[in-house]
Amino acid sequence: ASAVKYYSRWMEGKYCDPAKNQYRQHPLDYIEGLEATVKDALAQCPDGTAPNVVGIAFDTTGSTPVLTDKNGTPLALLPEYAENPNAMFVLWKDHTAIREAAEINELAKRWGIDYTAYEGGIYSSEWVWAKMAHVLRIDDSVCKEAYAWIEHCDWLPALITGKTKPEEVYRSRCAAGHKAMWSEKWGGLPTEEFLTSLEPKLAGFRSHLFEKTYTSDVKVGTLTPEWAERLGLTTGVAVSVGAFDCHMGAVGAEITPR
């Protein structure tokens, strides 16, 4: 069975401005889409299928990050930010952070460590640090509440397992390594000094984020009672670490190391 749900706000063209290369998505679009598609798919299955569903996994297009509060709640889910595009997910194809990406590249080339070494040697305006630096730089209002950021592929597993606090989220190695300049070689994310040299408003973010990352064969947890009820599934359903769609396509195609 398969199901499709068009994002209602996206279909209305909300929060996007093609003239500025701005493409934002409200987190409610994702929540509503998840509920609708799972229920629709189950409705197409024989009776008794739901108790036999044992796992859920997510792949998303990235980098699609969002600023969160201390509880890991995307800022757009708070009443005061509900209509602020800078408090929403910054879609992968949003290119409002071209300037910040250029600054990251210039900074990385003169830093002691080239944090773009495993990013293809050049950082993109489509990626998380450029986007978060841009949003914080242009919008003082979101700075008051912003505590951390999270990728779309990490937020959905965290949401439905009840593990949303930034320090306890299982972060995708796929997303962190490719977009956030994370590497075991230099101890995780770029240093606080590097990040604040890029944008002083990034101060403190690194300590609220992560050192460890996980691959998608790792279990984040199981559905919370609330989400089991919302999806029509059981609390025994396992949820895996998320990843990016293009990378998971390679897995599906059975691409293996040489």
What residue spans do the PLM features occupy?
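Short glycine-aspartate micro-motif
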Residues: N52-D59, V90, W149, G236-A243, ...
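Short beta-strand-loop/turn "lid" adjacent to the catalytic site in phosphate-handling enzymes
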Residues: N21, A43-V90, Y118-E126, P157, ...
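Conserved phosphate/anionic-ligand binding catalytic regions in large, soluble enzymes, centered on
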Residues: C174, V241-R258
